[in-house]
């Protein structure tokens, strides 16, 4: 029946989305626990040369996944944030400090200061409750890979409501509900 088809399609979409996010999440998890990222997170005195060497690990993750917009890594002892898109800066000068605030949602859609919508994945150490690595996934690229059969250019999936929204321009969402 049509209802069974709709439920099956919806379940397939959820599985595809979960698999796509898991691919990024597992690669980021491995990066988070790599010796280079651990050194970058925990070093009390790190030279620019060492930092550049360790940053290659973050750039490797960024370059192998087309959905990743940016990666931030926080060294709390030196109060430094290292990024793949804007170099490094002190945490106090960092323009996206809220990215390191605890996030209790599976997916949190938020807007970066330069108008890029992202899904944010946060990683913390075992004993640490504050996020120390953030992976921002470009929603447009990610959702475009899932919704290939539509002319829409903007998508939002709200997992708590199991609802998808799309738009064909810069108009306010929701324009069309996809489920």
Ranges and model annotations:
Residues 21, 47-51:
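Solvent-exposed, acidic/flexible segments
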Residues 62-148, 152:
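Extracytoplasmic/periplasmic ligand-binding sensor regions of membrane-associated signaling proteins
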Residues 29, 72, 155-157:
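Conserved beta-strand cores of small sensory beta-sandwich domains that regulate signal transduction
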């Amino acid at each position: 029946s049509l209802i069974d088809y709709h439920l099956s399609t919806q379940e397939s979409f959820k599985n595809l989305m979960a698999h796509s996010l898991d691919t990024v999440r597992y690669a980021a998890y491995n990066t988070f626990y790599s010796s280079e990222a651990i050194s970058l997170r925990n070093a009390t005195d790190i030279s620019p040369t060492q930092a550049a060497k360790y940053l290659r690990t973050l750039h490797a993750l960024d370059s192998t996944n087309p959905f990743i917009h940016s990666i931030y890594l926080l060294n709390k002892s030196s109060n430094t944030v290292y990024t793949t898109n804007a170099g490094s800066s002190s945490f106090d000068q960092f323009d996206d400090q809220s990215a390191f605030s605890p996030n209790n949602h599976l997916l949190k859609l938020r807007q970066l200061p330069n108008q890029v919508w992202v899904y944010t994945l946060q990683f913390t150490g075992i004993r640490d409750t504050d996020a120390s690595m953030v992976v921002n996934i470009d929603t447009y690229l990610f959702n475009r890979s899932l919704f290939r059969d539509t002319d829409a250019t903007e998508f939002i999936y709200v997992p708590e409501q199991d609802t998808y929204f799309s738009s064909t321009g810069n108009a306010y969402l929701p324009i069309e509900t996809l489920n």
